[in-house]
């Protein structure tokens, strides 16, 4: 299959298996959920009644005071006592096979092509690391919410995009399923397309 280059009167021949496969919603969902789960810090921690500081002495005798019976100041019922089901640090990451991950990326890229959300250009750059230059370039292309993927990370482009809302710049090795679906449009250079194709082959 061929992808038309927007800034040139030509087309780029690409693999049908990478940019023309059927959309596997279940696979994409599983990989996106796993990716988001892996980003969780999982460092929360609370103390149980066994871990909080406090005396082990019974606060008052069992009977005869008229008060409710009590055996410990560390009881979860008491103020400054332990937490009943205390949260502990945990690893939320989910295992995703390479084949599944690559399949999800191919599925997303193919769907972007079908929805006309993938724009392929010969090259994409700015002369200087100026936000104004990139903002004007995107305005000329009628792009607002956009992910720009280049073959090599262009420092000028990266610095120019840092202060733009809903604009991100990545190199081909930095793509992930969440960022590909998070933006309205994805702009890829011809070099990036070839690199992604080789990476997912």
UniProtKB/Swiss-Prot annotation:
Subunit architecture: Part of the 50S ribosomal subunit.
Matches recorded under NCBIfam families: rplD_bact (TIGR03953)
GO terms of biological process kind: translation
Similarity comment: family membership: Belongs to the universal ribosomal protein uL4 family.
Regions annotated as coiled coil: none
Region of interest (Disordered), residue spans: 43-73
A Pfam entry, by short name: Ribosomal_L4
Highest taxon above the source species: Bacteria
Gene Ontology CC entries for this record: ribonucleoprotein complex; ribosome
Function summary: One of the primary rRNA binding proteins, this protein initially binds near the 5'-end of the 23S rRNA. It is important during the early stages of 50S assembly. It makes multiple contacts with different domains of the 23S rRNA in the assembled 50S subunit and ribosome.
Alphabetic keyword roster: Ribonucleoprotein, Ribosomal protein, RNA-binding, rRNA-binding
Name of the coding gene: rplD
UniProt organism field: Sodalis glossinidius (strain morsitans)
Protein name: Large ribosomal subunit protein uL4
One MF term in the entry's GO annotations: rRNA binding
